[in-house]
């Protein structure tokens, strides 16, 4: 299966882009697993929700209670400058090395219902956010968020109780039985994997999401995210930064965290450095 969307960008003048989009094999009803691409809308919504709450910002530290899906809780982040987790630090790790735990923390901050409703309301109708990443959890556990508290020093800025998702999510695609064998944990199972309970976001919506981040001025106000210029700058910076360019966390092992580690376009099959004149946003 191969689906491609390509948009040619022409500029008639400053801030006057025009788009010409071409597709190959595009079928928005044919299921494919979005994998870590689902982290982009999660990052966008996390920044936006922090703005809406007003009492917190993306740099405030947070804690996730013990006894949740994270049995020991989430209290510290030794690889951050402050030593604590924050929305901004989580987003850095999500984009630079595709860190699943950081994405899951933002899933808990947002909640399943919030993610789906907000994305539907702004026009991304294909989205079906159903689960966290790389955790063996049942449906009830994925519907339940963990309590999370934001602090400034020792002062509590915002506390969010555990929530249970109520929004029914239908199956909106075809061909959901994929493959001939699959793994459940470490056990190999004969037969296709059933993707009816997996995340989904079609290629068209993923493509549109990128355009709204890079070219928000080309969309009407009700189709834009509630992000300031500073928010967009932060988001674009984290989308494009390479592991060797990150200070916190520091990824010193180039053989492991090479430039193409998460930049598959053009450089996904090589460990050579990406030239300075090329920036890849994903």
Residue locations for each model-derived region?
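A short, well-structured edge-of-sheet supersecondary motif
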Residues: 1-26
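Active-site-adjacent helix/loop patches that line small-molecule binding or acyl-intermediate pockets
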Residues: 67, 78-215, 219-222, 227
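A short glycine/serine-rich beta->alpha loop
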Residues: 26-34, 91
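Conserved SxxK-family serine transpeptidase/carboxypeptidase catalytic domain
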Residues: 196, 217, 221-282
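Short, mixed-charge aromatic SLiMs
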Residues: 65-77, 121, 231-247
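Short, glycine/proline-biased beta-turn/loop segments that scaffold the active-site neighborhood
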Residues: 52-83
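Active-site SXXK
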Residues: 33-58, 62
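Soluble periplasmic/extracytoplasmic beta-strand elements of cell-envelope proteins
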Residues: 3-7, 41, 63
């Amino acid at each position: 299966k191969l689906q491609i969307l390509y948009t040619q960008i022409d500029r008639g003048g400053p801030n006057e882009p025009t788009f010409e989009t071409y597709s190959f094999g595009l079928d928005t009803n044919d299921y494919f697993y979005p994998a870590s691409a689902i982290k982009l809308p999660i990052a966008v919504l996390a920044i936006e929700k922090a703005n809406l709450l007003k009492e917190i910002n993306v740099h405030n530290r947070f804690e996730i209670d013990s006894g949740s899906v994270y049995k020991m809780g989430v209290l510290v982040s030794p690889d951050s400058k402050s030593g604590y987790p924050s929305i901004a630090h989580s987003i850095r790790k999500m984009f630079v090395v595709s860190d699943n735990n950081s994405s899951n923390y933002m899933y808990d901050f947002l909640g399943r219902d919030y993610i789906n409703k907000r994305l539907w309301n702004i026009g991304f109708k294909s989205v079906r956010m159903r689960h966290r990443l790389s955790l063996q959890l049942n449906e009830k556990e994925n519907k339940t968020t963990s309590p999370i508290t934001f602090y400034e020093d020792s002062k509590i800025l915002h506390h969010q109780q555990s929530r249970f998702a109520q929004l029914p999510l239908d199956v909106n695609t075809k061909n959901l039985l994929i493959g001939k064998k699959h793994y459940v944990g470490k056990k190999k199972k004969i037969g296709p994997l059933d993707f009816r309970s997996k995340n989904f976001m079609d290629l068209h919506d993923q493509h549109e999401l990128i355009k709204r981040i890079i070219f928000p001025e080309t969309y009407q106000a009700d189709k834009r995210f509630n992000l300031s210029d500073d928010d967009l700058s932060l988001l674009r910076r984290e989308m494009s930064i390479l592991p060797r360019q990150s200070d916190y966390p520091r990824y010193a092992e180039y053989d492991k965290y090479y430039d193409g580690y998460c930049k598959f376009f053009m450089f996904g099959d090589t460990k050579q450095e990406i030239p300075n004149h090329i920036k890849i946003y994903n």
